[in-house]
Amino acid sequence: MASPMTGTGRVIRRYLPAAALFVALLVAWQGAVTVFQLREYLLPAPLRVVQAMTGDEIPWLRHLSITSVEIVGAFGLAGAVGVFLGVAVAWSPILSRALVPFLVFVNTLPKVAVAPLFLLWLGYGVLPNMLIGALIGFFPVVINTAVGLSQVDEELLDLGRVFNAPKWKVFATIRIPNAYPYILSALKVTATAAVVGAIVGEFVASQQGLGYVIITTQGSMNTPVAFAALVWISVVGLAVYGLVVLAARRIAPWAETVD
């Protein structure tokens, strides 16, 4: 009989494939630079990117903190607005018929084209980039929340009717807990969408942040710093995604979702 896997064994089994893939990509990257003798402005070596990440050429802490605030703010705004609208869609068929076409219209707007309008209305700063990130990330939360609130076991709803529970109580005690896995799955998508939105905003309407660093360093052919900014963006995105995964395991440990 096989012995139960220890905590260390579970961690290794869970993260070893990703770590192995990461190492393989680094080796392939370094091999391509070495074999093809690529110039630094085309593709810098991994070690050169690490040096750029830890160097003092760029005030990384300042740019990193600004982008992090934008991403977290965009994620929080998209999540809150998305859940609220999803509840509204599921609450009333009239609201659903009124809101869904409008939300689809908003979601299909090209966000790069909307970004300059936010700059015109709000000026430079963190808020426009947060709004762009929220605009990209809110729609999956709306749809998943509405679906989760609707896909409820009829026996549970019958139980609520037996006790003459009002509609708001059925939502609070039956429908919303049922929607947790759907909402949390959507928030994982929103976590990455918030990163994309914040960086798009910094490309168009910012004078600070990691997206701004990429734009300025590409213009000067300083590719190692541009790659370093990309890595820092990925680190922030992974951190936000990881926090959502941890929250999902605590709030809805029964949910079968892909981490």
Where are the regions that the model predicts?
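Transmembrane alpha-helical segments of polytopic membrane transport and secretion proteins
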Residues: 1-21, 242-259
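Periplasmic/extracellular loop-to-transmembrane helix junction in inner-membrane transport proteins
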Residues: 3-8, 35-79
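Hydrophobic alpha-helical transmembrane segments of polytopic membrane proteins
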Residues: 211-246
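Short cytoplasmic-facing helical segments at TM-TM junctions of multi-pass membrane proteins
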Residues: 141-144, 148-189, 210, 214
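Transmembrane alpha-helices
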Residues: 131, 135, 168-201, 228, ...
